[in-house]
UniProtKB/Swiss-Prot annotation:
Keywords carried by this UniProt record: Molybdenum cofactor biosynthesis, Pyridoxal phosphate, Transferase
Active site (record annotation): 413
Task of the protein: Sulfurates the molybdenum cofactor. Sulfation of molybdenum is essential for xanthine dehydrogenase (XDH) and aldehyde oxidase (ADO) enzymes in which molybdenum cofactor is liganded by 1 oxygen and 1 sulfur atom in active form.
UniProt gene name: hxB
UniProt protein name: Molybdenum cofactor sulfurase
Amino acid sequence: MEGDTRRMWTQSESESIRSSKVRPLPLRKVTLYLTFVLIGVADTTYLDHAGTTLYAKSLIESFSRELTSNLFGNPHSLSASSQLSTRRVDDVRLRALRFFKADPDEFDLVFVANATAAIKLVADGMRDSTRQGFWYGYHVDAHTSLVGVRELAEKGGRCFTSDDEVEDWISKLCDVRSESLKLFAYPAQSNMNGRRLPLSWCKKIRNQGETAGGNVYTLLDAASLVSTSTLDLSDAAAAPDFTVLSFYKIFGFPDLGALIVRKSAGQIFEHRRYFGGGTVDMVLTRGLQWHAKKQSSIHDRLEDGTLPFHDIIALDSAFATHERLFGSMQNISSHTRFLAKRLYDRLNALRHFNGQRVCELYKSPRSDYNQPSTQGPIIAFNLRNSQGSWIGKSEVERLAAMRNIQIRSGSLCNPGGTSGSLGWTGADLLQQFSAGLRCGDDHDVMDGRPTGVLRLSLGAMTNLEDINTFVEFVEEFYVEKVATMDSLVTPVHSVPLQQPRFYIESLSLYPIKSCGPFRVPDGRRWEVRREGLAWDREWCLIHQGTGAALNQKKYPRMALIRPSIDLDRNVLRVTCEEPGSTNQKLLEVSLLREDTELATTSLCQRTSKASTVCGDQVTVQAYTSPSVAQFFSDFLGVPCTLARFGPHSSTRYASPRKAPGAWKQYLRKFVMPGSFPQEPSPPPAEKNPILLSNESPILLISRSSVNHLNENIKANQKRNRTGTSKAVAADVFRANIVVAESLADSPKVEQPYIEDQWEALKIGPGELQFDVLGSCQRCSMVCIDQFTGVRRDEPFSTLAKTRKINNKIVFGRHCSLSASEVTKEQHDNAERWTLMVGDIVTPSYAHDYDL
């Protein structure tokens, strides 16, 4: 047994296993369920084994014993420690070949960083082997790293869009005899949907290619396949010329890859131009420029520089641990096949109340989860609501993460597979690229189609509990069980005849983006600018290495950084304090823009996937003082410094939020046709400048809505018996304005979400006018407690069930100073452009609710 946190099959699971034709791992092996190094992983449902599988605690312990019991030197030396490393590397190389049943007389194995590095090694060898260049063909299901080889193929190439095209090309290879060098590459298993391609192509191509001149080589990407299946290279005549893979996909650790070369194809590397340390017998640098490459083996010529010998020695421990835990790859293959079939069937069976499918599954018609030769344990899919609309992949992944479920979403580095499954043409994607679509962004649905997929991939340590957890997650959040009009907004008929009085309960600004709030003191009027409240999100913290703006989603401790504005002393005061601690750190910087500690730098937020402003590139002024950088770096544990983006340098604008008819479009699902007239074309949108806020100058929420949300949270937790409920504070929504109702007047009952009906606002004695731009789309950052920096499940989980429209989770309203206000002659009156706690808020109600 390995540790005390092992997981056992339940009685129901065992009965299900016995009745199935496909067998998972034997029970004696399953009881060796791994304990892992990372704290808390026992509570995690990990379904991203195609990215990397999980490593066993005993693997790390075994490797640690190796390091503490032996002295390993650089293999390029002749010392005893170096020779020990050399012997161990040779032994592991042989063990790796035998793991894939590859005869060392027929094959050589080259250690590389990963499968991509192995692909590039082959591509460079092909390019250097002849001055005429080479022709390159690849299957449409290829990983991006295989696709990239085409840029080195001077003889051109071809993307084969189907298996039939490949078969047709193979059959015609012998028709034309050619001396031109050719390389055909394909994946043994699609990393997108797990479809397995014919391994027989390599032998067919070799047989046909020999008739055509013998210059056709094959490259097999086995990285996805070998994580859960045997790769059998025992028949050298049928094996690929080059096979690439990554060991971390099999064992989780070490981070190492391999290129397995048929020795008969090794001549491809004879003209490789680059040489590194350890690959040559002699090098002349004075006078004659000459070198002699090593000829003893293929790996001696290709492994440039010092090998990662510690990682290779760790691989020996990985082989031993893997065999002890699972016995064989065949056991893992049977185990994952059983679970994948179960998961696929359950997802495929999910239906909404009206019979509509919940999951759109992207499985090849050629594949079958019961047939290991055609399908691996990967499932690619998207979700739809009951009306057939797509649910954004990013929302699903974020909500899953809140439930400790780890999955993958996006195009998965498989451009051909995803575009084909989703129906995108090359012209379509070019158009969407021009519209802003980028790899890793949050553009989930464009032109009515998803831009990526969700992926579940299973591994040796996956069990039925993991399958049940994910399916139950989908059922809880995405299966609509009854036809209801969600109580997202107050219904049309409930707009009160006698409107309630609203007032500003609190005013907050966030001087440093993603850090704590500064609450405007009661009785003090605060300036409002076109960009929002004065000093709001004028600063940010940037990573000193990448220049990316930091945010709470990645660094929750930013909530404990509390800035305040001292107008009397003209300083930004920042404190950092651990919850319950009296040890407070203090920093003050000048509010004056002429601060000599500022230096202009470029901030490219594109590098920050989690930020909603990541499409913008802005220029900020970074503080050069080492003490400023140390203040924030020490507290967050990340190298960062403070930077400023002032109102006079703003080149950012609020996102156009209003979508006339959005609420009507939602209502049309439930009412007879013709109930709503056709909307006129909207007028051109005004541009509202913003600083470093995500989407708009001002964010407003309602106290009544927060109270109602907390009632829903309490009810959900009582219904699910999840323990004592804990209300969320309004602070988690990071609003600038919290509006409350004056219940002393009629009606005396709070009206949650009535702000969804607001079109404009007049605030204060001067009736300062604001436009309501639309609703605020929420992400998992609302789950970070702003007083402790601790991440929770709520309120995002409840919002996902109660505040979703057009497949977006919304709470709060985006606002901006009215354009008419800006153009008034008296706008220079500073007293007019101010707000204060207690100011009366008078809303204008829209006839159409623009969510």
